[in-house]
Amino acid sequence: MPQTGPLSALTDDQTGREGRPANRTVAAVENAPQHPTPHTPVITAPAPASASATTATPGTTTGINATTTVTKELAHRTTDTDVFPTRWSRISDTRFRFTAHWSAAHPFFGPVDDRHQDPMVVGETLRQASMVLAHAEFDAPADTHFVMWDLTVSTDPSALLLSDAAEPVEIDVVCSEIRRRGRGLASMRTTMEFRRAGRFVARGTGSTGCTSPLAYRRLRGRQLAEVGTPVPLLPGIAPELAGRSRAEDVVLAPADRPGVWLLRVDTGHPVLFPRPNDHVPGMVLFEAARQSAAAASGQRPFLPRTMTADFARYAELHSPCLLETELLDEDPEEVTVRVSGRQDGEAVFTATLTSARTAEVRSPS
């Protein structure tokens, strides 16, 4: 299992022997930003936000305790409003401190009810901060493709209150299991602890691999040639069953039996698909797991205390992906759901999510 203990349990020089978690194959990939010249992309950073902050580009390393501004290019987003980590400083070669902001008004990672922010914002912030560090601190080139092997997040939903949304989030980061390829980065694990106003909010860890454009083209050449081919948009289930307030944010479609859904892929969604892609992004699969758990359990809101996901292969855009759920226990205080994604008879990912019990919304499927 991924390491989720206190950050103090990890030393600065802890590295993996193989640079890849055991029993992992391929995984969900975060594409490099698209550029007019695909073989030589360049990331440009805006001017510093203030005299005390700098900006970073891939291949640069910040000074100890220097504060650096996060750009949307480093975070692989296309709009500033989708970038959650705002700045960071380097404590040592493998320890960093980020500041993040979680807007209560974000169109996708917004409120889940009248009191709570969306716990999924923790995983997305971890994902973005990991890519920022890979580029700016560990020499991953601008055109790197990032491969997510696993992601684990634990949260305290009572600390994810809308009333605290204006407060900055402080994130302590340890990078471990670092594997180099030449001077660049091959893979690493990031472990993060999130606090707001001094209170523990969440802890998360994930392992990521780096793939060069050449290797990625060898691996995904056929799928890359199909980028831009229309993907049929399936009808979604009712938003309230998926734990969403807007129909356009639903990533589940009805299937032919109870407890099973089809992945609904909307390649025009501005947050889930900010740029053309050759596969379903990992954040879409993570969201599909949460929505499946909400629909299967009938819990509303479904506020995950723990979420784990392991990715086995790419989720393709042009083939049906089944999401199968299993309720694991009947604890009176909480509910745990296992979600398995399968495509063409093969496992794509597995996820397990646990939430406190709340009012139930019954699903007709």
Q: What annotation goes with each model-predicted range?
A:
Residues 145-148, 154-163, 206, 218-221:
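A cross-family "folded-core" feature that marks the main globular domain of proteins
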Residues 180-226, 336-365:
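Mixed-charge, glycine-accented linear interaction segment located at domain edges/termini
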Residues 98-104, 142-152:
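A short glycine/small-residue-enriched secondary-structure motif
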Residues 151-197, 305-347:
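Hydrophobic beta-sheet segments that form the core/acyl-binding groove
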Residues 247-322, 338-340:
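Acidic/His-leaning functional-site neighborhoods
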Residues 5, 283, 361:
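Basic, ligand-binding patches in group-transfer machinery
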Residues 1-114, 209-272, 364-365:
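Non-catalytic linker/capping segments at the edges of enzyme domains
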Residues 117-145, 280-302:
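Active-site helix/loop of acyl-thioester processing domains in fatty-acid/polyketide metabolism
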